[in-house]
From Swiss-Prot:
Cited function: Binds to actin, and functionally associates with actin structures involved in the development and maintenance of cell polarity. Plays a role in cytokinesis. Plays important roles in mating and in spore formation.
Region Actin-binding 1, residue ranges: 98-368
Top-rank taxon: Eukaryota
Binding site for Ca(2+) 2: 66, 68, 70, 75
Region span, Actin-binding 2: 369-614
Cell compartment(s), UniProt: Cytoplasm, Cytoskeleton, Actin patch
One GO cellular component term noted in the UniProt record for this chain: cytoplasm
The protein, known as: Fimbrin
Source organism: Schizosaccharomyces pombe (strain 972 / ATCC 24843) (Fission yeast)
GO biological process: actin cortical patch localization; actin cortical patch organization; actin filament bundle assembly; actin filament network formation; actomyosin contractile ring organization; endocytosis; formin-nucleated actin cable organization
Length: 614
C-alpha cells in the first residue's frame, strides 16, 4: 500500500528503488516507531554514498520535514529523490558560503574561515565535558555544527566557558542514553541560552530567538557564537585584572578617560605601545587593513618574545607566505589560534581581533607596577555599580545606538536616554528639539548636551517621575546617584508598561501589587515563605525567589538542589539556580546572584517584574 502511494508521488523513481528505500528505512527504524531522527537519516545517506552531510541536510529541508524533525518513510524517499536530482543549497565563493534563507528570495552569507575557526575553539574548550564531550570534535568542514547547536547544550557550555557560572547547568535538559531531546526541551535550553547571552554584556540579541537555534539558522547561530567568544576574550581586558594596563595611558590622559575606552580600543593601544617600544614607525588603528600585510604582527611578536620570534618574515615579499611565517612565530608562543594566513591577508576583522585578544590574554608583555606606580582607583560602589550594570544591559536590550559600554559617560549627551523614552513609549520624543551628535564623531558641545538632558528630565517629569533636584547638567556631569535615579524610573516605567499591556484590567501595578503577586505565587506552590517588601532581609537566602518560581512552574524547581541559604555561598547557589530557572521560563533577567543575596530592592523588583511578564 505504502509502495503504491510512493510510486504515485515519485513516478521518476523505479519500483526497485522505492522498495529498497522502504526496506532500508525499516531496518533503521529498530524500535518500530515509524520515523527516524535527522542524525540517523543523514548518516544513512552518507554511509550509502548518496550524498554528503550538507547535501542530505539540505535535502531534508527541501522535503519540508515537519517541525518535530521526524523523518517518516515518505520523507525518506523524498530525500533520496532530491539527492538524485541534485541539491541546490549552498554556494561557496572566495571563502564565503551563500545559503538559502527562509524563503526562495532570501539568502544569507557566512564566512567559511570564521565557521572553521570558531568550531576549532569549541572543540578545544568542550573536549572532555561530561555532558557534550562525546559530541566533539565536531567536523569543521560541514554544517553539522549548526545541527549540534539545536538542543542548546553546546551553546550553554560555550557561554559558561566565556563567562563562568553564567548558567547554572543543573537547570539544563540533558540527553539520556544518547537520545536526542524533544523540541520542547530544546526550546527550554535555548531560552536559557538567549536570555543568558542577553545578560552577559557586550552581546546584541535583537534578531535571534530560541526557535532560530532549534531550526539551525546558520547565519544567526554563527553570529551569536562569535559574540559569545568575543565576550570571553575581551572580558579579560580589565585594569582590575591587569593593573599594568596603567602603562598604556598617554601623556595628559587621566585614568578616568582611559577606563572609558572600549576593550577593542585598549587592545589597539596595547598593540601600538609595543610597536612604539620596538622603534617601529607604523601604528595600527583597526583589525583589518593595518594588519593584513603581517608586518605589524611580526614586530609585535618579536617585541613580546625576541628569543623565540624573529623579524625574519619582514624579508619575505609574498604576503601570504609572510602571514604563514607570522603564525608560525605565534605557534612558538602557543598562540596560533583563530587566525589563518588567508584571513590575515584578507583583513578579516573578527579573526584578527580574536587573535590579538588571545595574544594579550596570554602574553601581555607589560611590566608589573610597583607600589608607587599603582593608580588610585575609585572605591567600588557596590550598589551603584551593580545597578549601572543592570541598567546598561536593559538599555542595550532596547537596541539603542551606539550601544553602551560605559554607563555614566555614554549617557552624558542625553541621546541614549531620549532613544530609550521613544522605545518605551513611541512618539514621545520630538526629535526636532534634539541636538544631534556631531558627524565628525567628536564629543557634543556641553551646552547642547545639557539641553538634551534637560529635555530627558522634562520627559520624566511628564511621566510622573520623582526628579526633585535633578537637572540636565547633573546627567551631563556624570552624577552617579542622580543618573541612576533617572534611569531606574525609566526602567520601572518600562516594566509597568509591559505588565499593564498583559493585565486584563489594564491596572498600573504598584510595588505592593508586585509583592502581593510574588507572595501569592510562593503560596500557590505550597511554600510558606512571604516578604513584606523588596527590601525584606529574608530575600537574601534565595529561597523566596525559588518558591515563587515553584509556584509558577513546580516541575522546574528541584528542592533537592535548594539549600537553606544560611551562608553567603549557599545563598548565591540558590540565587544562581533561580536566575537560570527564570531564564528557562523565558524571562529576561539582567541581575546577578549577588544582587538577590545583597537584597538590592530595585534589582529584586526587576527580577519579579520579569517573571510577571512571562
Amino acid at each position: 500500500m505504502l509502495a503504491l502511494k510512493l510510486q504515485k508521488k515519485y513516478p521518476e523513481l523505479t519500483n526497485e528503488e522505492i522498495l529498497t528505500l522502504t526496506d532500508q528505512f525499516n531496518k533503521l527504524d529498530v524500535d518500530g516507531k515509524g520515523y527516524l531522527d535527522q542524525p540517523t537519516t543523514i548518516k544513512a545517506f552518507e554511509d550509502s554514498k548518496k550524498g554528503s552531510y550538507d547535501e542530505v541536510r539540505e535535502a531534508i529541508r527541501e522535503v519540508n520535514v515537519d517541525s518535530s524533525g521526524r523523518v517518516e518513510p515518505e520523507d525518506f524517499v523524498g530525500i533520496f529523490n532530491v539527492l538524485k536530482k541534485g541539491v541546490e543549497g549552498t554556494e561557496v565563493k572566495k571563502g564565503r558560503i551563500t545559503i538559502k534563507g527562509s524563503s526562495s528570495s532570501v539568502s544569507h552569507t557566512i564566512n567559511e574561515e570564521e565557521r572553521r575557526e570558531f568550531i576549532k575553539h569549541i572543540n578545544s574548550v568542550l573536549a572532555g565535558d561530561p555532558d557534550v564531550g562525546s559530541r566533539v570534535p565536531i567536523n569543521t568542514e560541514t554544517f553539522e555544527f549548526f545541527d549540534q547547536c539545536k538542543d542548546g547544550l553546546i551553546l550553554s557550555k560555550l557561554i559558561n566557558d566565556s563567562v563562568p557560572d553564567t548558567i547554572d547547568e543543573r537547570v539544563l535538559n540533558k540527553q539520556r542514553n544518547n537520545k536526542p531531546l524533544d523540541n520542547f526541551k530544546c526550546i527550554e535550553n535555548n531560552n536559557v541560552v538567549i536570555n543568558s547571552a542577553k545578560a552577559m554584556g557586550g552581546i546584541s540579541i535583537t534578531n535571534i530567538g530560541a526557535g532560530d537555534i532549534l531550526e539551525g539558522r546558520e547565519h544567526l547561530i554563527l553570529g551569536l557564537v562569535w559574540q559569545i567568544i568575543r565576550r570571553g576574550l575581551l572580558g579579560k581586558i580589565d585594569i582590575t585584572l591587569h593593573p599594568e594596563l596603567y602603562r598604556l595611558l598617554e601623556e595628559d590622559e587621566t585614568l578616568d578617560q582611559f577606563l572609558r575606552l572600549p576593550p577593542e580600543k585598549i587592545l589597539l593601544r596595547w598593540f601600538n605601545y609595543h610597536l612604539k617600544a620596538a622603534n617601529w614607525p607604523r601604528t595600527v588603528s583597526n583589525f583589518s587593513k593595518d594588519v593584513s600585510d603581517g608586518e605589524n604582527y611580526t614586530v609585535l611578536l618579536n617585541q613580546l618574545a625576541p628569543e623565540l620570534c624573529s623579524r625574519a618574515p619582514l624579508q619575505t615579499t609574498d604576503v601570504l607566505q609572510r602571514a604563514e611565517q607570522v603564525l608560525q612565530n605565534a605557534e612558538k608562543l602557543d598562540c596560533r589560534k583563530y587566525l589563518t594566513p588567508t584571513a590575515m591577508v584578507a583583513g578579516n576583522p573578527k579573526l584578527n581581533l580574536a587573535f590579538v585578544a588571545h595574544l594579550f590574554n596570554t602574553h601581555p608583555g607589560l611590566e608589573p607596577l610597583n607600589e608607587e606606580e599603582k593608580p588610585e582607583i575609585e572605591p567600588f560602589d557596590a550598589e551603584g555599580e551593580r545597578e549601572a550594570r543592570v541598567f546598561t544591559l536593559w538599555l542595550n536590550s532596547l537596541d539603542v545606538t551606539p550601544s553602551i559600554h560605559d554607563f555614566f559617560n555614554n549617557l552624558r549627551d542625553g541621546l541614549i536616554l531620549l532613544q530609550a523614552y521613544d522605545k518605551i513609549t513611541p512618539n514621545t520624543v520630538n526629535w526636532k528639539k534634539v541636538n544631534k551628535a556631531p558627524a565628525s564623531g567628536d564629543e557634543m558641545m556641553r551646552f547642547k548636551a545639557v539641553e538634551n538632558c534637560n529635555y530627558a528630565v522634562d520627559l520624566g517629569k511628564n511621566q510622573g517621575f520623582s526628579l526633585v533636584g535633578i537637572q540636565g547638567a547633573d546627567i551631563t556631569d556624570g552624577s552617579r546617584t542622580l543618573t541612576l535615579a533617572l534611569v531606574w524610573q525609566m526602567m520601572r516605567m518600562n516594566i509597568t508598561k509591559t505588565l499593564h499591556s498583559l493585565s486584563r484590567g489594564g491596572k498600573t501595578l504598584s510595588d505592593s501589587d508586585m509583592v502581593a503577586w510574588a507572595n501569592s505565587m510562593a503560596a500557590k506552590g505550597g511554600k510558606g515563605s512571604q516578604i513584606r517588601s523588596f527590601r525584606d532581609p529574608s530575600i537574601s537566602t534565595g529561597v523566596f525567589v525559588l518558591d515563587v518560581l515553584h509556584g509558577i512552574k513546580s516541575e522546574y524547581v528541584d528542592y533537592n538542589l535548594v539549600t537553606d541559604g544560611s551562608t553567603e555561598e549557599l545563598a548565591i547557589q540558590n540565587a544562581r539556580l533561580a536566575i537560570s530557572i527564570a531564564r528557562k521560563l523565558g524571562a529576561v533577567i539582567f541581575i546577578l546572584p549577588e544582587d538577590i543575596v545583597a537584597v538590592r530592592p530595585r534589582l529584586v523588583l526587576h527580577f519579579i517584574g520579569s517573571l510577571m511578564a512571562v
